[in-house]
Regions:
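Positively charged n-region of N-terminal signal peptides that target proteins for export
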Residues: 1-4
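Bacterial N-terminal signal peptides
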Residues: 7-15
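Boundary at the C-terminal end of the N-terminal hydrophobic targeting segment
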Residues: 18-20, 25
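Flexible, processing/modification-adjacent segments and terminal tails
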Residues: 26-27, 32-44, 49, 55-57, ...
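Extracytoplasmic
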Residues: 38-40, 59-61, 69, 79, ...
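Short hydrophobic/aromatic-rich beta-strand segments that constitute the beta-sheet cores
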Residues: 45, 72-76, 91-94, 145-147, ...
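An acidic-aromatic
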Residues: 63-115, 185, 191
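Gly/Pro-enriched, hydrophobic low-complexity segments
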Residues: 102, 125-206
């Protein structure tokens, strides 16, 4: 009797695991298909920084533009003006006082940051098995992907990266960056437009 019950429970558990793995694979496939179909993306964003040492949150706002083939413009407009542009292997950092151009191939830190930003906005981090261990779950009307860094340099920066996807569009709606010390940055994407023409000037690095 006990042996039969154990066999039944084992079978039931195996079935649940199998169904979960199938669901996970289907979600990943839908996200990958949506990312591949997204040639451009434009949106507003609200970034909220939660610091363990402070009770007040730091909120900033801005505009993001993405173009498939490694181009990203991340522009803060409030409470300060600051722009980061990624164009393949070049990064431009610009504010009102100065601007700097960085070759990411010669700066490992910026290469990692550029990779995380570029891949997070469309969900491609899910396909980077060498950099992240990831799990995907359905929660309400969204999919939530939790990414745990695997490489040593990534572990020094982040404990987890959590991506929230709309189930309807299979697109990222929110990114959470949990740092090693427990500080958390939440980025919410709003007014998203996809596959509309973006001027090449938006990604100029010089």
């Amino acid at each position: 009797m006990k042996k039969g019950l154990l066999i039944l429970l084992t079978f039931h558990f195996s079935l649940l695991v199998s169904l979960a793995q199938q669901g996970d694979a289907q979600i990943r496939q839908k996200i990958s298909q949506a990312a591949a179909a997204m040639k451009t993306m434009q949106c507003d964003f609200v970034q909220t920084k939660h610091l363990k040492m402070l009770s007040e949150e730091m909120v900033s706002k801005g505009r993001m533009c993405y173009q498939q083939s490694q181009c990203l413009r991340w522009e803060y407009t409030s409470p300060y003006d600051y722009t980061l542009i990624i164009n393949h292997d070049k990064v431009l950092l610009k504010n009102r006082q100065r601007q700097d151009v960085i070759d990411v191939n010669q700066n490992r830190f910026f290469k990692e940051i550029a990779s995380i930003m570029m891949n997070s906005v469309v969900g491609n981090c899910l396909n980077d098995d060498k950099s992240f261990k990831s799990t995907v779950t359905a929660r309400g009307g969204e999919w939530v992907a939790t990414l745990t860094p695997q490489r040593r340099d990534m572990k020094q920066m982040f404990r987890e990266i959590i991506l929230h996807f709309s189930q309807r569009e299979a697109m990222v709606t929110q990114v959470e960056l949990i740092e090693k010390n427990g500080d958390r940055t939440t980025i919410e994407l709003k007014n998203v437009k996809t596959n509309e023409t973006i001027s090449p000037d938006m990604f100029t690095v010089r």
